[in-house]
């Protein structure tokens, strides 16, 4: 996706600020205000630069702020072009260089462990994976082998019907047009034994954005480009829409 000096998009990303990176980007199709957190998903061919933090889908939801309920706002494809032939020094403080694929794998494993600690209070399920299964899981992620990946992923997850026993659901909420991410600690059930809804969780953690538990008034919750109804059971949503790192990433879109 790009010429020999262009970039190859992958599902890994890093970030910097637009105002400090202006000279490195010759074409950003999305209108981004100065200073907005820019999440880039790229690998520059000549310099073999790999970068990682956010998946490109999450980046799109978070940074465009587009309302999925309005089809006229969809922008596809989302094109980011990295200028790699500048005379000035590469901005290594903003766009991280990843030396090897093993570095990416190690980061992903770390995220899996972090999610496991949130669910179980420890990382034993991930640590107990055999080397063969760990490598097989990674290879399937790289090759987009959905069936193989989730056949192993399900072995380190509590069964969905046992979700009530989960210590807390691994959830990260991203505030609109900012660099703030909230790692929410959310129990799958309320104190009275009822299943927690996404509306209850967002109202509890972000009452300014969600003054109501049942109706979006100020912002909408978006996962994988789809608006999530606030009455959705959070545990069910987690099992249906978690990312390959074991987290459910929720971005907020402001209501105009």
UniProtKB/Swiss-Prot annotation:
Keywords: Autophagy, Isopeptide bond, Membrane, Protein transport, Transport, Ubl conjugation
Post-translational modification: Conjugated to ATG12; which is essential for autophagy.
Its membrane topology: Peripheral membrane protein
Record has Protein biosynthesis as a keyword: no
Gene Ontology terms: biological process: aggrephagy; autophagosome assembly; cellular response to nitrogen starvation; mitophagy; piecemeal microautophagy of the nucleus; protein transport
Cell location: Preautophagosomal structure membrane
Crosslinked residue numbers (Glycyl lysine isopeptide (Lys-Gly) (interchain with G-Cter in ATG12)): 113
Gene Ontology CC: Atg12-Atg5-Atg16 complex; autophagosome; phagophore; phagophore assembly site membrane
Keyword hit for Transport: yes
First and last residue of the signal peptide: none
Subunit annotation: Conjugated with ATG12.
Family: Belongs to the ATG5 family.
Function: Involved in cytoplasm to vacuole transport (Cvt) and autophagic vesicle formation. Autophagy is essential for maintenance of amino acid levels and protein synthesis under nitrogen starvation. Required for selective autophagic degradation of the nucleus (nucleophagy). Also required for mitophagy, which eliminates defective or superfluous mitochondria in order to fulfill cellular energy requirements and prevent excess ROS production.
PANTHER family per UniProt: AUTOPHAGY PROTEIN 5
Name of this chain's protein: Autophagy protein 5
Species, as recorded: Yarrowia lipolytica (strain CLIB 122 / E 150) (Yeast)
Gene: ATG5
């Amino acid at each position: 996706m790009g010429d020999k000096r262009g970039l190859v998009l992958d599902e890994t990303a890093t970030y910097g600020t637009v105002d400090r990176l202006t000279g490195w980007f010759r074409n950003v199709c999305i209108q981004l205000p100065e200073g907005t957190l820019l999440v880039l998903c790229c690998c520059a061919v000549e310099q073999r630069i790999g970068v990682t933090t956010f998946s490109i889908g999450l980046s799109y939801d978070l940074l465009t702020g587009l309302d999925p309920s309005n089809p006229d706002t969809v922008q596809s494809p989302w094109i980011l072009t990295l200028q790699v032939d500048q005379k000035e020094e590469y901005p290594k403080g903003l766009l991280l260089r990843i030396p090897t694929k093993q570095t990416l794998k190690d980061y992903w494993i770390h995220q899996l462990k972090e999610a496991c600690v949130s669910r179980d209070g420890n990382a034993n399920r991930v640590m107990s994976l055999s080397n063969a299964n760990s490598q097989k899981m990674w290879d399937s992620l790289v090759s987009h082998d959905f069936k193989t990946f989730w056949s192993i992923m399900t072995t380190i997850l509590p069964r969905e019907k046992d979700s009530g026993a989960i210590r807390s659901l691994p959830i990260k909420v991203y505030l609109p047009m900012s660099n703030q991410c909230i790692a929410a600690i959310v129990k799958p059930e309320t104190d009275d034994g009822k299943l927690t809804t996404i509306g209850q969780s967002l109202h509890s953690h972000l009452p300014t954005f969600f003054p109501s538990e049942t109706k979006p008034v100020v912002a909408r919750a978006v996962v994988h480009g789809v608006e999530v109804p606030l009455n959705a059971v959070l545990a069910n949503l987690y099992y249906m829409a978690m990312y390959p790192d074991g987290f459910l990433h929720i971005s907020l879109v402001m209501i105009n």
